[in-house]
């Protein structure tokens, strides 16, 4: 039993790691290092993180995940996009790709639009091109049998995807046909060349009025029918032909904002941001683009947040204000900070969280960035701190970030690794970090399933923060406290005699190692079936200026360490 004249030095509630300062100088409630410790489920307690379970076994490394859409969970694995484990799009080239759910005007289904080197869209009906290419063949008109048309006429035609009489998407028009002069005749139509695009159901014919220059809708013809005739009187023609239904350019990033699809990472125009017509993501007029900065600072990504639109370049970021009527205008942020790892960008109630060269930040685009990574600064400046290797920026393209339930999960490459090998977890409530020793190649949040999911290099898609094992494998946890100098400070020598461990190990064995001035002075094997304070002797002559504890556990349950108290006697200087 501890002697009554000994003084206690107790650990307070723990909040997370601090790599910014010397282990003697960090706050009493901060830790020098942690691995696989969960500070979210029970703040202040040392306990293993929650586990992970297998959702899908894949075929290759998962490098993009999107939350479930209807009955599908989408992932990009190498150059293929999968809906669950079914390949739905191939040839997905480039370092980045974006998968964006969008329900276009008149549609009854939501499509997953795939921005990549091969622009596609997928729904339960199958995979088709994103947008419809215009006809390139020139139609031919001629005078036909007796009819009601008199004057000079020409036509143009488009390709369309229709359901019944409703147009879902339509291309730009063909070249203008020849002019034909009629005198109470029918206009015959030929060379209405069929589209080879599987999504096209109809050819839509637009005709002038007599001597007119505008093209008005005349009729729809089933795709594959290459001839026809126009008989309607001029007053029966309806909608004006649209000439700005361009399919989107090849881009590798897309997002929805104000019912439009915005697109960037255009390799031919790296500083462009394109935007579609409202409600019509497959129509991106050639004039609908913004030049952001200059080509030497390419746009990396964009997001919609709290009614605002923001874009990141490598060096800075911009808020895009305005609308179709007033025009869109980019305004550079007061914090000139961009990102080279766009998959770390995450929209959340805490702002838009992202990773930059100098740390993890939250932004609104309209005000100064808020830094979240002060306590782990060392890994951003090429330092190895308390066993944590610095970030390897050569792997920045593979970094991922996701906010879920009050935490930001940041998966990155450390040391010499070129694929992610560790996850840093920021707790917004505690304003501190923990680290998980798991290799994650993609992250996503599924609100409908209340889950954070992840991809791994073997193609597996897993659910994080569930259960107490990693797919039946044990979890190894460790935590190292600060160097406690006790009330007297680091200049007064002390004799440490006992240590008390307040824990509930759930029947498991947790090891608590006590170091005095970096010398191991006691190894405590703590095993309890309920919360208990256990007292342990330290080695005789455990004298020194400061002490620390190292807590370790490997297993498949959830032991908890609440507090450690070292009992000591201050020694009078000679």
Question: Which role fits each region the language model picked out?
Answer:
Residues 300-318, 339-352, 357-358:
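Beta-propeller domains
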Residues 2-5, 12, 88-269, 280-289, ...:
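Disordered, low-complexity "stalk" and linker segments at domain junctions of extracellular
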Residues 1-110, 184, 297, 336-340, ...:
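Beta-sheet repeat architectures centered on beta-propellers
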Residues 113, 255-264, 303-313, 353-355, ...:
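Hydrophobic core segments of beta-strands in well-ordered, beta-rich domains
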Residues 309-334:
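Surface-exposed extracellular loop regions of Gram-negative outer-membrane beta-barrel proteins
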Residues 78-79, 117-118, 258, 267, ...:
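Surface-exposed loop/turn positions within WD40 beta-propeller blades
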Residues 120-121, 270-271, 317, 360, ...:
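Structural signal for beta-propeller blades
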Residues 84-86, 124-125, 162, 208-210, ...:
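Inter-blade boundary loops/turns of WD-repeat beta-propellers
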